[in-house]
């Protein structure tokens, strides 16, 4: 685990402990009982793949540790509507506050504003967070293999499945991919960003994709800025992408989303 992930785990553990006191698990379960069923995150991505279309997990992210505020006029419901109108298959919403200025209500309001399934994008360490995610309306959780032992990842995955949710398992290298493939989820995200150096290289996805059979659905994460980037990864069997910052910075988010997916206009230059 990198120093960055250790620091994040330390503050997340503190957040989790405080949340368990503030909102007991029984209360979360009661809120979940009032939720409509999960929308089917993996199914939405699979439907795009079956039609031969690119599948986009469009991210709603207010800020990042390295670049600060990303979008001054940050409006999660309007962004969700724009992504949906532009052809996105799913949403990814940051809920981590210390590093990304995220919040639970961003997820809840974005999901309420459109028909797309939503991922809780956060650092998951405790099954309590899985119940939180479902109570907030999430349809999928993220497991970052670089921050989790195998037993912890399996326990989090099982908790999500029990709630009818999907699981996106994120990897960056061959060792993490090997571990991810021992889990049950067929959704595997390849992060092209090195968390130690922050360098981004699409070759990471191209290299790791060779380890995966066709029964898995691969997601290219980070470094996808243009339709040409999508076409490049398509050659390695990756037709689903998680993209956020480059879309969030555009004045016309709907048009930028459409351009990324279809190449309809050259308006999505790399940031």
Curated annotation (Swiss-Prot):
Pfam families xref list: IGPS
InterPro entries: Aldolase_TIM, Indole-3-glycerol_P_synth, Indole-3-glycerol_P_synth_dom, Indole-3-GlycerolPSynthase_CS, RibuloseP-bd_barrel
GO biological processes: L-tryptophan biosynthetic process
PROSITE patterns: IGPS
Family to which this protein belongs: Belongs to the TrpC family.
Enzyme class, UniProt record, top EC level: lyase
Keywords linked to the UniProt accession: Amino-acid biosynthesis, Aromatic amino acid biosynthesis, Decarboxylase, Lyase, Tryptophan biosynthesis
Name used for this protein in its record: Indole-3-glycerol phosphate synthase
Catalytic activity: 1-(2-carboxyphenylamino)-1-deoxy-D-ribulose 5-phosphate + H(+) = (1S,2R)-1-C-(indol-3-yl)glycerol 3-phosphate + CO2 + H2O
Enzyme Commission number(s): 4.1.1.48
Source organism (scientific name): Sinorhizobium medicae (strain WSM419)
């Amino acid at each position: 685990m990198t120093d960055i992930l250790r620091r994040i785990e330390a503050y997340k553990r503190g957040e989790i402990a405080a949340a368990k006191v503030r909102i007991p698990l029984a209360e979360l379960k009661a809120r979940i009982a009032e939720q409509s069923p999960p929308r089917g995150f993996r199914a939405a991505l699979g439907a795009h793949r079956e039609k031969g279309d690119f599948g986009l997990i469009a991210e709603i992210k207010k800020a990042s540790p390295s670049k600060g505020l990303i979008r001054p006029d940050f409006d999660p419901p309007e962004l969700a509507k724009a992504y949906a109108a532009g052809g996105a298959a799913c949403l990814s919403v940051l809920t981590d506050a210390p590093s990304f200025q995220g919040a639970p209500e961003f997820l809840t309001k974005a999901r309420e504003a459109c028909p797309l399934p939503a991922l809780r994008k956060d650092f998951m360490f405790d099954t309590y967070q899985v119940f939180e995610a479902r109570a907030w309306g999430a349809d999928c959780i993220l497991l970052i293999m670089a921050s989790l032992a195998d037993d912890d990842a399996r326990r989090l995955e099982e908790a999500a499945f029990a709630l009818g949710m999907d699981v996106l398992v994120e990897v960056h290298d061959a060792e993490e991919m090997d571990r991810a493939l021992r889990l049950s989820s067929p959704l595997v995200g390849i992060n092209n960003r090195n968390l130690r150096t922050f360098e981004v290289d699409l070759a990471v996805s191209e290299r790791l994709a060779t380890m995966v059979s066709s029964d898995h659905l691969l997601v290219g994460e980070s470094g996808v800025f243009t339709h040409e980037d999508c076409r490049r990864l398509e050659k390695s069997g990756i037709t689903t992408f998680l993209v956020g910052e480059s879309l969030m910075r555009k004045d016309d988010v709907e048009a930028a989303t459409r351009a990324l997916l279809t190449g309809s206009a050259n308006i999505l230059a790399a940031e």
